[in-house]
């Protein structure tokens, strides 16, 4: 027993013992879809090789990293915990033609999480044969006559990848799409409009693309309210705010079932959500076996990094009070929900 878990990393998906560090990496699932005779499928051979390489890479990171304190170096190398996760899950579902909030979506989530977990375990056991088990192995739950011999005390964690997914140009973590066309707020008050590339391609191929449509969506119009878009496309490109909180929890639970540490996931609530609504989701998360959960109520912050409705001038009491305190005047608060924000803890 190395002690009690005392904290998590900032987004809560990695439980940490005193002086442990957080060593995470994420596989872009949108790159794991192949096509045969016009039929998309998950390329599990490619995914298997990617998992094996990623586990080795993360173990190498522990070895070459220069930690700020000797205590961190000691604890990190004692357990050698890594956290391999995913991003681009929503993009994968879109390529497969499967809406996010469906039973088939949950089946795919469990299937992928299970596969990655098994492949990560195999890769860590191979590393143990090559480099040895983690030093604290004899004090661990794996120290049994027939127990697995791992190089890393834990192998999988699902992070939100809010910034990483921007670099990789894919959907964040296991989140659904936040919006199809939206304004992204960056440094020094600048902003720019982004359009989901899969939606843009389908819109052009199906003949309903227009700059005006992209502008309307960026200004907050919901896809379900656009008449010229076919119903099956509306269903496929469901966004975070169109998915019920219960479905958000179900999807997180599907991944948590096969994840060593925790899963970071935002449950988006409408602005009018009540404390009872939130309590219901907390209880559902507990019943589903989640290790933590994050909720976000629409427009409960003054400014978000991504907003599907930049012109929404809804009265925002918290922002108004802050502005009055600073000598500013009343104020509106545009915005939408988390979309890649933090998630469940340990």
Model feature map: region roles:
Residues 1, 71-82, 106-111, 134-149, ...:
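A glycine-rich phosphate-binding loop feature that marks nucleotide/adenosyl-phosphate handling sites
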Residues 16-33, 54-71, 82-96, 100, ...:
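Core alpha/beta catalytic barrel or barrel-like domain that forms the active/cofactor pocket
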Residues 305-312, 325, 329-346:
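Conserved small/polar residues in nucleotide/adenosyl-binding loops
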């Amino acid at each position: 027993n190395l002690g009690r878990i005392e904290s998590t990393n900032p987004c809560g998906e990695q439980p940490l013992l005193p002086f442990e560090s957080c060593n995470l990496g994420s596989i872009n699932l949108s790159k794991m879809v192949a096509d045969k005779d016009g039929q998309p499928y998950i390329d599990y051979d490619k995914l298997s090789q990617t998992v094996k390489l990623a586990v080795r890479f993360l173990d190498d990171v522990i070895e070459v990293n220069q930690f700020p304190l000797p205590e961190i170096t000691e604890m990190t190398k004692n357990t050698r915990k890594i956290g391999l996760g995913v991003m681009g899950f929503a993009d994968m579902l879109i390529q497969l033609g499967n809406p996010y909030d469906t039973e088939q979506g949950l089946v795919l989530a469990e299937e992928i999480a299970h596969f990655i977990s098994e492949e990560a375990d195999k890769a860590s056991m191979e590393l143990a044969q090559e480099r040895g088990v983690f030093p604290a192995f004899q004090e661990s739950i794996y120290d049994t006559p027939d127990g697995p011999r791992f190089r890393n005390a834990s192998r999988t964690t699902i992070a939100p990848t809010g910034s990483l997914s921007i670099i990789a140009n894919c959907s964040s973590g296991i989140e659904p799409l936040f919006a199809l066309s939206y304004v992204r707020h960056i440094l020094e008050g600048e902003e720019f409009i982004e359009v989901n590339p899969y939606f843009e391609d389908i819109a052009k191929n199906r003949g309903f693309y227009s700059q005006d449509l992209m502008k309307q969506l960026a200004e907050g119009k919901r896809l379900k309210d656009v008449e010229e878009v076919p119903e099956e496309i509306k269903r496929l490109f469901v966004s975070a705010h169109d998915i019920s909180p219960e479905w958000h929890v179900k999807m997180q639970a599907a991944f948590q079932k096969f994840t060593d540490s925790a899963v970071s996931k935002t449950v988006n609530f409408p602005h009018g959500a009540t404390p009872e609504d939130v309590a219901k989701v907390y209880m559902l998360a507990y019943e589903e076996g989640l290790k933590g959960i994050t909720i976000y109520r629409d427009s409960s912050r003054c400014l978000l990094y991504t907003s599907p409705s930049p012109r929404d001038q809804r009265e925002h009491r918290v922002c108004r009070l802050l502005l009055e305190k600073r000598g500013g005047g009343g104020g509106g608060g545009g915005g939408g929900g988390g979309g890649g924000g933090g998630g469940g803890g340990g």
